[in-house]
Swiss-Prot record:
Name of the featured protein: Actin-1
Keyword ATP-binding found: yes
Matching PROSITE patterns: ACTINS_1 (PS00406), ACTINS_2 (PS00432), ACTINS_ACT_LIKE (PS01132)
Family membership: Belongs to the actin family.
Superkingdom of origin organism: Eukaryota
Any one GO molecular function term: hydrolase activity
Enzyme class: hydrolase
Annotated PANTHER family: ACTIN (PTHR11937)
Amino acid sequence: MADAEDIQPLVCDNGTGMVKAGFAGDDAPRAVFPSIVGRPRHTGVMVGMGQKDAYVGDEAQSKRGILTLKYPIEHGIVSNWDDMEKIWHHTFYNELRVAPEEHPVLLTEAPLNPKANREKMTQIMFETFNTPAMYVAIQAVLSLYASGRTTGIVLDSGDGVSHTVPIYEGYALPHAILRLDLAGRDLTDYLMKILTERGYSFTTTAEREIVRDMKEKLAYIALDYDQEMETAKTSSSVEKSYELPDGQVITIAADRFRCPEVLFQPSFIGMEAAGIHETTYNSIMKCDVDIRKDLYGNIVLSGGTTMFPGIADRMRQGNHCLAPSSMKIKVVAPPERKYSVWIGGSILASLSTFQQMWIAKAEYDESGPSIVHRKCF
């Protein structure tokens, strides 16, 4: 890595729902596209159309009407490596237009993922893409870098997995990390179910994307759920309409806050788990009593599923009810939190002190994929 100065590392945050990719040192990702691989449902009859057997990302999204869409990552864990390779290939060659064999690559991963997952990631980077060096970083830790803190508890909630990671003076506290397999995709599925009950049919993988868009545009989190329900029954202030691609208009009211309420009450979808506010509290309680005060004062939200309006207030109120009454609770919701994992990766990969942390190809050739557990936290 002697000539590392003139080579920009690549940062690729492979989310369950979206891939965020770009160059270290930039302040935002260059490429953001859905982690989707689509395959045609029908046989092609017109010759010379240049039809492909698989489409990736935005192209798959735009042709979704004729494709079966598959997400290769589920709950933050790669379930289909062939499709994942397609996504990485698309990221490097089509989106960023770089040769991966010329750049170190920083990848991200959810905490408490199976060890085999990061080993396979390492193997593909070195053997398929021939990268000179790579590193796998924990997503929530990167979000804390992006917020400019060294102490705090990060609630990172994306499309596939949510987790709380307490960090004190730069040290992650692994015994207190909690993972909740409840995130954006579960909310989308729940909204699909609610809409089906109301007589709208959303069943295919392509229609799920419409519901996801509806969720992102219209859903919000009520500060007091029961009271908001009463308001919705009597007044029309909550009503919003959404136009489907075919021009049909749907009106949704109470469903706007019923859908993301699942984050705080997972029992809505039959999950026997604590809500995100309680998970954060449980995570803090697993930490040493001396550092809890600092964690309560620095609850940092990150990831796309924390973008709902009203989430910070509700989070503060939820923890206020659980924590000691005199405790000062501060919830930080940075406006760029949708991309804060990527931004943190960009910061980390461009630090001069980080340059000796990369796993070099030579080290990989010597030790094999298991090197990733020794070099990456």
